């Protein structure tokens, strides 16, 4: 057991999907995994281990924001030996070419958080995805016919930002979307020498406000990213 995860050693696979919403973790376990067993209910942050196409895979919620995913990802890596971590979540488009329900693979993650600067105040340490996972995910998504964008994202510390226009301005510099977790996940992956990737479904748009989705859609649909994430985890 770790501080925030109730699993015993051996109950969590070395490959895991990380949705922010614990109910999305439950949805993935019930709809994609065979023989799924719940290994964690602490703080209602549900985690499950099962099999996908014969491969042992886990899925667990992380909550919202970089502090929350940092806690769970670190414990999964350090206490349970997880080697491949793929975030599957939602993001808001910052780019007019990126539309609702399309996929974004975060090649890198800029951030306005001090989560990295606290450790490296003298450097702008880049948060980047595992190239191996990124390459596999891109080709899997294209093979499945999914509209997929690859590029930089913004991992924001603030959801209700007072600097809304600044976020939109980043879209003009090629930033695809804004979300709240990828930079922290990539930073931990660099620190502990594991592989990480963030796959997001666009749930709304900061530049096309007429594009939107409901809370129920965000919880129970967006299955494309789940399929890509699972296929990427088991790809040789």
Swiss-Prot record:
The keyword Transferase applies. Keywords: Glycosyltransferase, Transferase. Pfam families: PNP_UDP_1 (PF01048). One of its GO terms (cellular component) is cytosol. One of its GO terms (molecular function) is purine-nucleoside phosphorylase activity. It is an enzyme of class 2 (transferase). The keyword Repeat does not apply. PROSITE patterns: PNP_UDP_1 (PS01232). A purine D-ribonucleoside binds at residues 4, 179-181, 203-204. Belongs to the PNP/UDP phosphorylase family. This is Purine nucleoside phosphorylase DeoD-type. The lineage of its organism: Bacteria, Bacillati, Bacillota, Bacilli, Lactobacillales. The gene is deoD.
